[in-house]
Swiss-Prot record:
Stretches that traverse the bilayer: none
Taxonomic lineage: Bacteria, Pseudomonadati, Pseudomonadota, Gammaproteobacteria, Enterobacterales
Gene name in the database record: slmA
A molecular function (GO) term: transcription cis-regulatory region binding
SUBUNIT field: Homodimer. Interacts with FtsZ.
Entry similarity comment: Belongs to the nucleoid occlusion factor SlmA family.
Name of the featured protein: Nucleoid occlusion factor SlmA
Source species: Serratia proteamaculans (strain 568)
Functional description taken from the UniProt entry: Required for nucleoid occlusion (NO) phenomenon, which prevents Z-ring formation and cell division over the nucleoid. Acts as a DNA-associated cell division inhibitor that binds simultaneously chromosomal DNA and FtsZ, and disrupts the assembly of FtsZ polymers. SlmA-DNA-binding sequences (SBS) are dispersed on non-Ter regions of the chromosome, preventing FtsZ polymerization at these regions.
Alphabetical GO biological process terms: cell division; negative regulation of division septum assembly
Coiled-coil positions: 117-144
Length: 198
């Protein structure tokens, strides 16, 4: 019984990896059908539905992976790093680096892969970015408590500016067919961003 469950889990992972790879390829700029996905995996559409009740559920699983990866690591950054600007820099680098290592998932993060899917999926991505923005805002607000100095500009505005930078870099990555890496020249960009936060 355990062996059967392991095979099923492996097939599920194989399906999700195939979907992510298709999103990374030129197929990712178009609607991915279950027929195309089944052909890519080398199984029938019926076999896909034995592992996932719908394509929406496949996207849900990929979004869950994105959420778990980012939020877990953001929490580790907040736990390990105490200095405000280092926290912010590491959170931005985390989001950009994750996208760079997972181009297919970046299409989901930017919403490009979800244009032809259920609105609920886009809502989940919106919630993810709202959570990241809330974390950035909290880091900014905690500066006064941790370091004894606040910001001239409202923390809400600053957090949205940092998130907009991230989202812009992810969109550029997708638009360029993954040529312009999100972390490219980050070391030069960060001082410009940090200067806006003073």
């Amino acid at each position: 019984m355990a062996e059967k469950e392991k095979i099923k889990r492996n097939r599920r992972e194989e399906i999700l990896q195939a979907l992510a790879q298709m999103l990374e390829s030129s197929d990712g700029s178009q609607r991915i059908t279950t027929a195309k996905l089944a052909a890519n995996v080398g199984v029938s559409e019926a076999a896909l539905y034995r592992h996932f009740p719908s394509k929406t559920r496949m996207f849900d699983s990929l979004i869950e992976f994105i959420e778990d990866s980012l939020i877990t690591r953001i929490n580790l950054i907040l736990q390990d790093e105490k200095e405000t600007f280092n926290r912010l820099r590491l959170i931005l680098l985390l989001v950009l680096g994750f996208a760079e290592r997972n181009p297919g998932l970046t299409r989901i993060m930017t919403g490009h892969a979800l244009m032809f899917e259920q609105d609920r999926l886009q809502g989940r991505i919106n919630q993810l970015f709202e959570r990241i923005e809330a974390q950035l805002r909290q880091v900014l607000k905690e500066r006064k408590l941790r370091e004894g100095k606040g910001f001239i500009v409202d923390e809400t505005l600053l957090a949205s500016q940092l998130l907009a930078f991230c989202e812009g870099m992810l969109s550029r990555y997708v638009r360029s067919e993954f040529r312009y890496r999100p972390t490219q020249e980050f070391d030069g960009r960060w001082p410009l961003l940090a200067a806006q936060l003073q």
